[in-house]
Regions:
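Family-specific signature for flavin-dependent thymidylate synthase
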Residues: 1-246
Length: 246
């Protein structure tokens, strides 16, 4: 079933969200104590006794094993979030990437202003765009820097070194050649943590149970918005939360 996403401009966005297997997993939650199985889940009418059972099982202590039916309730959605949220999300084993935007492939073509969240400083954006411009026009800048050097030598009445080449200077004092390879290293290394990337994710209610439990009071506000959205998914408030959240 399709469910609503959410959008907090410049912070986090969820779209194209769907939930699968809700009814089927509710039915299957009875199997451990059943003497038969449901031959046609489409025809089965979920009753109050089924909801009572899953409310009890779903709110079991995390890790007890009694809430395993939650694994059958699948959730897929597009998530746009900054780099620091993605790195924290990666610690969860049962939320996975279907496909995602690639910084390695597209950093030179992204609209950097649009891709950075509102907390990234103007200085950081200007610096990143500078190195991207260098990369995209490396030959022109090599000639420009060479000309500037020669003109400076003439102005200062210094001998021009015919082998002089512009170097990239690192903060540790090291110098690197002004090449596309080295410029790309600088671009990737100086991409801010507030860089927003979108990925299609797949997970399940059991994993969401852990995320909600661990991230609802996180110091990063993005997690508050994400977990609030998770809490609003169908039946999450009835079969995932309550007892263990108190």
């Amino acid at each position: 079933m399709k469910v609503n996403g959410m959008n907090v401009e410049g912070i986090v966005r969820i779209a194209n969200a769907e939930v699968y297997g809700l009814k089927q997993s509710i039915i299957a939650s009875a199997y451990p104590m059943a003497t038969s199985y449901c031959e046609d889940m489409d025809q089965y009418v979920v009753e109050e006794k089924d909801f009572k059972r899953v409310r009890h099982l779903g709110k079991a202590t995390p890790g007890s094993g009694h809430d395993c039916f939650l694994k059958g309730i699948q959730v897929q959605f597009d998530l746009q979030a900054p780099e620091y949220i993605w790195r924290q999300l990666d610690r969860y084993h049962f939320i996975d990437y279907i496909s995602s935007q690639s910084k390695m492939h597209m950093i030179l073509k992204f609209d950097i202003d649009e891709m950075c969240n509102k907390y990234v400083t103007e200085d950081a954006i200007v610096n990143l765009k500078k190195y991207i411009d260098y990369y995209n026009n490396v030959d022109w800048y090599s000639g420009r820097f060479k000309k500037d050097y020669e003109e400076d030598c003439v102005r200062r009445r210094r001998k021009i070194d015919p082998n002089w080449e512009f170097k990239l200077k690192l903060r540790n004092g090291e110098e690197m050649e002004f090449t596309k390879e080295n410029l790309f290293k600088m671009i990737i290394a100086n991409c801010p943590c507030g860089f927003m990337l979108t990925a299609r994710m797949t997970t399940n209610y059991l994993q969401l149970k852990s995320i909600i439990n661990q991230r609802s009071n996180h110091k990063m506000q993005e997690w508050h918005y994400i977990t609030d959205w998770m809490k609003g998914l169908p039946l999450v408030d009835e079969i995932v939360m309550k007892n263990w959240e108190d």
